[in-house]
Every structure is written in structure tokens, then in C-alpha cells.
Design a protein with these regions (language model features):
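Charged, low-complexity, helix/coiled-coil-prone segments
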Residues: 8-19, 41-59, 84-87, 143-152
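Short, charged low-complexity intrinsically disordered segments located at boundaries
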Residues: 65-75, 101-106, 140-147, 227-236
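An acidic, glycine-/histidine-flanked metal-binding catalytic module
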Residues: 2-35, 42-48, 159-236
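Terminal, regulation- and interaction-focused segments at domain boundaries
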Residues: 94-100
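Active-site acidic/histidine clusters and adjacent loop/turn architecture
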Residues: 25-71, 76-86, 93
Length: 236
């Protein structure tokens, strides 16, 4: 009798949540594999560029697979159905990689090198460097389809890649912390100050890049001089 009552009053919503958990666990493996694939390609590009140009464009990489809770919240906020099939269709940032570069030029260099690969397809691009957000946020966002090889064969998974400089990352991290502490509500005065800081940091970003380029030209000139005189010294 107790068993019959249990079956009668069982919440059908619990079934959908449990099914979604199982779907998430399965799909998480695909998204995690996509992140590993992107990270491996970025590390290879950074290493090869360093060998050829004596400069590492990438400072560091960060990555994450969005949690089931975050997925559900984002789907609810957008008004989309809350299911993993809906998440696959409507969300492009379940798998995310953040590429923190040294200089602004490095951002577009890395993006172009990655997008030049035949099996990488561009889904979406948002250039917040050319067009910063109203709060001052700057970064290059691209969403790409990357192939991953699972036991059931080749699958494609979208990965959102945020590419920014160390300075942009510094501002974004602190700005997020300030807004979180203020529960998302900050005065116009603070908003203006944060935007001003973003502008100052941007100016510094470009100045640092100019300094680096100037030093690079000096080193390149020195190397050229060494290449010209070395054969003569060897002949002597």
C-alpha cells in the first residue's frame, strides 16, 4: 500500500530533472573534450609562434564547462525551454575558453591563426575591442565549432572563446567583483569611474604594445647585423 502511494504521489518534475542530469553528464564529456581540443591547438600555436618570432602571444589560458545550475538559470532567463536539447540549441557558451594575451595585436593574431584551420568553423563573432560595451568592457568573443572524436565517432561542439589582454582581464575581473559585491546595483558615479578606468587601461595597453614593438625592432636590427658580420668573422 505504501509503495502504491509513493508511485501515485511521485513528482513528475523530478523525472525531468533526473533525466536532465543524466543528459548533462553525457554531454559534459563532449564539451570537456572540445575544450581540451581548443586548448591543445592554442598551445601549439603559441609554441610555434614563439619558436619563429621569439614572442609568446598567449600569457595564459582558462577554461570551464558551464554547470547544470548555470545552464538552467540562463535558459529560464531567456525564456527558452529548460532541457539539454534546448541548451544545445540555444546556448553557445556551455564550453568556454578564455585566452589572455600579452598585447592587443596578439588577440587578433591568435584568433586569425585559429580560424585559419580547415576544421574550425566560425559560428559567431563579437568584437568588443572595436565596439566596447557601455560599461567599458573590452574583449574579442568568437564561438567556433570544433570536431571531437568520441567512442561514437566524430562530433562537433561549440566553444565560446574570449580573447583579451592581461590589462583587459585585470579590469574585467575587478569590475565583476565590484558589481557582485554591490549585488548588481551600482551608482552612476561608480559606473562612470569604472568606464574611465577601462579607458585609461586601454591607453596603457596600446602604449605597452608600442614599447614592445620598438624593442622588437631594435633586437631584429641587432640580429640582422650579427647575421651579416658572422660569416666574415668565421672566414677570418
Amino acid at each position: 500500500m505504501q509503495q502504491e502511494n509513493k508511485q501515485r504521489f511521485e513528482d513528475p518534475f523530478e523525472h525531468s530533472i533526473e533525466a536532465m542530469r543524466q543528459d548533462y553528464a553525457q554531454l559534459r564529456g563532449v564539451y570537456a573534450a572540445a575544450i581540451r581540443e581548443i586548448n591543445a591547438r592554442l598551445q601549439t600555436l603559441d609554441s610555434d609562434f614563439s619558436y619563429r618570432n621569439r614572442h609568446n602571444p598567449i600569457h595564459h589560458l582558462e577554461s570551464r564547462v558551464k554547470s547544470l545550475t548555470s545552464i538552467c538559470k540562463k535558459l529560464k532567463a531567456s525564456g527558452a525551454p529548460v532541457s539539454m536539447s534546448s541548451a544545445k540549441k540555444n546556448l553557445h557558451d556551455i564550453a568556454g575558453v578564455r585566452v589572455v594575451c600579452r598585447y592587443v595585436d596578439d588577440i587578433f593574431r591568435i584568433a586569425n591563426l585559429l580560424l585559419a584551420q580547415d576544421d574550425i568553423s566560425l559560428i559567431l563573432k563579437k568584437d568588443y575591442i572595436a565596439n566596447p560595451k557601455p560599461n567599458g568592457y573590452r574583449s574579442l568573443h568568437i564561438v567556433v565549432d570544433v570536431p571531437v572524436y568520441m567512442s561514437q565517432g566524430k562530433l562537433y561542439a561549440p566553444v565560446e572563446i574570449q580573447i583579451r589582454t592581461v590589462a583587459m582581464d585585470f579590469w574585467a575581473t575587478l569590475e565583476h567583483g565590484i558589481r557582485y559585491k554591490a549585488s548588481g546595483e551600482v551608482s552612476q558615479n561608480i559606473v562612470d569611474q569604472l568606464r574611465e578606468c577601462a579607458n585609461v587601461i586601454t591607453e596603457t595597453d596600446y602604449k605597452m604594445q608600442e614599447i614592445f614593438k620598438a624593442l622588437q625592432q631594435v633586437h631584429d636590427a641587432d640580429d640582422s647585423y650579427q647575421e651579416e658580420i658572422t660569416p666574415q668573422l668565421i672566414q677570418k
